[in-house]
Regions:
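Short beta-strand elements of extracellular/lumenal beta-sandwich folds
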Residues: 168-176
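Residue-level marker of structural boundaries
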Residues: 5, 61, 99-103
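Extracellular S/T/G-rich loop segment that most often corresponds to the catalytic His/Ser-adjacent loop
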Residues: 13-83, 87
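C-terminal subdomain of the subtilisin-like protease fold in secreted/lumenal serine endopeptidases
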Residues: 20-23, 32-35, 83-162
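Residue-level detector of functionally special positions within alpha-helical transmembrane segments
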Residues: 1, 66-68, 130, 135
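Active-site environment of divalent metal-dependent phosphoester hydrolases
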Residues: 2-9
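A short beta-strand-to-loop transition that corresponds to the Sensor-1 phosphate-sensing loop
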Residues: 1-2, 27
Length: 176
C-alpha cells in the first residue's frame, strides 16, 4: 500500500517489494488505474481495488479502495488454482497467475508501460502495474484451450468483390 496517500507514487513498498512476496497494485474493475495506488517496477500484478464492497464491524457493508482490497482478489485466484491443482508448488501457482494476467491494462494506462518516477521521468522497461490484471478465468482455463496471442499480424484480402473487406467466401493471406 501507499499509506493512504491520496496521490499514487513511484515507490518500492515493503514488505510488498521483497522478492518472495507477490506485490499487488490496486486498479479499477475496468482496468483503469485511478492515480492513487502505488506503482513501481517491483509490482508483480494488478487487481481490482476500487469500490470493493466489504464488511464493516457493527455497521454492515461499505465500499473501500486500496491494495487491501486488491490483494485478496489476487490471493483468491491463487486459492482457486490450489483447489484445481493441489500438487502444484507455490512457484507454479504464482507463475500461472502472472502468465494468465491480462496486459490490456497497459492499453488503458499507456503512461505506465515505462514507469514515470516521482519526477515524471520514465524508467524504461519497468512495467509498473505488474504483468497485468489478475484473470481467474484465464488462470483456470489455460489448460482447456490454447492461450495464443498474436501481437504482430496482417492480412490481405486476395479474392472477392474488390472492396478490400473480408466477406464470406472471400480469400485472404495471413502473415504472422
Amino acid at each position: 500500500g501507499n499509506g493512504d496517500d491520496p496521490q499514487g507514487y513511484y515507490s518500492e513498498e515493503y514488505p510488498a517489494a521483497y522478492d518472495n512476496v507477490l506485490s499487488v497494485s490496486a486498479i479499477g474493475c475496468s482496468g483503469s488505474w485511478g492515480g492513487w495506488a502505488t506503482y513501481h517496477e517491483s509490482v508483480d500484478l494488478a487487481a481490482p481495488g476500487e469500490n470493493i464492497l466489504s464488511a464493516v464491524i457493527g455497521e454492515g457493508y461499505d465500499s473501500w479502495d486500496g491494495s487491501s482490497m486488491a490483494s485478496p482478489n489476487a490471493a483468491s485466484v491463487i486459492g482457486l488454482l490450489r483447489s484445481y491443482y493441489p500438487d502444484w508448488s507455490n512457484d507454479q501457482l504464482i507463475e500461472r497467475v502472472l502468465s494468465s494476467s491480462d496486459d490490456f491494462i497497459y492499453d488503458l494506462n499507456p503512461d505506465y508501460v515505462d514507469c514515470p518516477d516521482n519526477s515524471g521521468n520514465p524508467v524504461v522497461g519497468g512495467y509498473c502495474l505488474g504483468a497485468g490484471m489478475v484473470d481467474a478465468y484465464k488462470a483456470i482455463g489455460m489448460d482447456f484451450s490454447p492461450n495464443i496471442k498474436f501481437k504482430n499480424y496482417s492480412f490481405e484480402v486476395v479474392g472477392g468483390d474488390g472492396d478490400n473487406v473480408l466477406n464470406p467466401g472471400d480469400s485472404f493471406d495471413l502473415s504472422l
